[in-house]
Amino acid sequence: MFALGILPALLVLYLRRSVPESPVFEQRTRTGARRGVMETMRGRWKLLAYMIVTMAVFNAFSHGSQDVYPTFLKLQMHFDTHVTSLLTIILNLGALVGGLVFGQWSEKIGRRRAMAIACVLALPAIPLWSYGGSVLLLAIGAFWIQIAVQGAWGVVPGYLNELSPDDVRGTLPGFAYQLGNLLVSWTAFAMTWVAHANGGNYAIVQSVWIAIVAVLLAILTWFGPEAHGAKFGVTPETGDATMRGSPAVAD
C-alpha cells in the first residue's frame, strides 16, 4: 500500500508542468507587491487565533466521529470484519455527499451559516449512530452523521481562503489547519482511554464527545468572522472579516 501511494504523488509533476498559476499570483509576481508574514498579519492575530481554535474543534469533530468507530463496531457491537468494513464504507459515502451538498449550499446561504447548520444536524443522528442496534439503523446513523460532519468540513477550504489576506493565503489556511489538528491529536487516545475506564462503553463516550463538539463548533462558526465573496487580489483592511450581525457581511 505504501508503494502504491507513490503513484498519486507523481501527479504533482503533471500539475507543476501543466496547471497554470492563478491570475492573482501572476499579477502579484509581476508587480512585486508582496509583504512578509509578520507585516501582513499585523492587527490580525485574533483572526489567526480564531482560525486555529476553530480548526482544532473541527478536527475533534471529524476524528471523534471516525477514528474509534470501527473499534466500537468490533469490540462493543461484536461485528465481524465484513460488517465493520461495510459500515465504514457507508460512513464515508455520507461524508462525500455532505461535503458536496453543504459546500455548494454555502455559496447561497453563507459559509458560517452552512457550517453551523451542519453541526446541528449531527445531533439527532447520534442515537442511531451509537445505539441503532441493528446493522441497518447503524448504517443510517453513520451515513447521516458523516453528512453533517463532512458537510461542515466541505465549507472549510473556501471559508479559510476567504478569511486569509492575499500575501499569506498560501500559508495561513494550511498552518491553521495543521496546528489545530496538532492540538487535538490526542482525540482517539482520549476516547479509547475513557471507554476502557467505563467498561468498554464506546457508545456513550463517542456520543457525549460528538454532542459537545458539535454544539461548540456551531457556536464558533455561527458567531465567527465571515468574508464570503471576498475578491482575491484585493487585500481587505483589518476587520473586513466581520462578526455575525455586522452590516458589512451578507448573511
Show where each model-derived region lies:
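Flexible cytoplasmic inter-helical loops of multi-pass small-molecule transporters
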Residues: R16-G36, A230-D240
